[in-house]
């Protein structure tokens, strides 16, 4: 396993000073930490295998990190179950429910998170779905490991093109998304959060559907029942 204290936590190349912007990719660790204060510290090792890197994004019910798989020597994405309205971080790693009255909701959400992982594991190799390759529990919460996609969200792509795209460009993105949804629906699973933020265009032009968000909506459904 590489020495984590000398790594850039984005590209995972060796650097002289990880606290300074990376000379290879420009990543600024201090800026990322400031933006996501409840996230795991970069350099944390999960499941004796994955070195946690920068935060890719944080939603109401989870945090997604880029990580380095020390067995495969490759970057992956790891999603952590961390519902921000009912849990907090203790001692830098452990996830703890803030109030006993929310313990049932936390557990219910964790079950839906696990269901999402099991479902996505069925789609390893699908060209338009970021499949799950591994799942594990640690720090009193749950994690799953996904393909790391280097590219831009459809939302960013639209913004970078002046806020609009042509019909042909839209079809080139949405037809693969519909293929992904067809495959997922055939397994009885519903995405329920298809937004430009959750559609990614990789550097080679491939379109991937991300973040099935089952925990978020299932908890909402439970609270209304």
Model-derived regions: residue spans:
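Protein kinase catalytic-loop region centered on the HRD/HxD motif
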Residues: 178-189
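Conserved short submotifs of the Hanks-type protein kinase catalytic core
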Residues: 139-153
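AlphaC helix of the eukaryotic protein kinase fold
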Residues: 90-122
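Protein kinase glycine-rich loop
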Residues: 53-59, 64
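AlphaC helix of the protein kinase catalytic domain
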Residues: 154-165
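Activation-segment/catalytic-loop signature of the eukaryotic protein kinase fold
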Residues: 135
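Activation segment signature within eukaryotic-like protein kinase domains
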Residues: 173-174
């Amino acid at each position: 396993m590489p020495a984590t204290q000398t790594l850039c936590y984005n590209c995972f190349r060796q650097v002289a000073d990880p606290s300074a912007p990376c000379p290879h990719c420009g990543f600024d660790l201090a800026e990322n930490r400031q933006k996501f204060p409840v996230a795991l510290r970069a350099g944390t090792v999960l499941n004796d295998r994955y070195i946690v890197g920068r935060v890719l994004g944080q939603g109401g019910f989870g945090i997604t990190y880029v990580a380095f798989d020390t067995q495969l020597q490759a970057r992956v994405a790891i999603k952590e179950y961390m519902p921000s309205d009912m849990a907090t971080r203790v001692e830098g790693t452990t996830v703890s429910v803030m109030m006993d009255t929310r313990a049932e909701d936390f557990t219910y959400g964790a079950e839906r998170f696990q269901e999402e992982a099991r479902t996505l594991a069925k789609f390893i190799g699908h060209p338009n779905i970021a499949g799950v390759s591994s799942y594990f529990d640690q720090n009193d919460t749950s994690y799953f490991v996904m393909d790391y996609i280097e590219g831009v969200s459809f939302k960013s792509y639209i913004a970078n093109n002046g806020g609009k795209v042509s019909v042909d460009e839209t079809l080139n993105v949405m037809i693969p998304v519909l293929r992904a949804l067809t495959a997922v629906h055939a397994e009885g699973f519903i995405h329920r959060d298809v937004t430009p933020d959750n559609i990614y265009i990789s550097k080679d032009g491939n379109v991937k559907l991300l973040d099935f968000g089952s925990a978020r909506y299932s908890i909402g459904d439970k609270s209304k029942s």
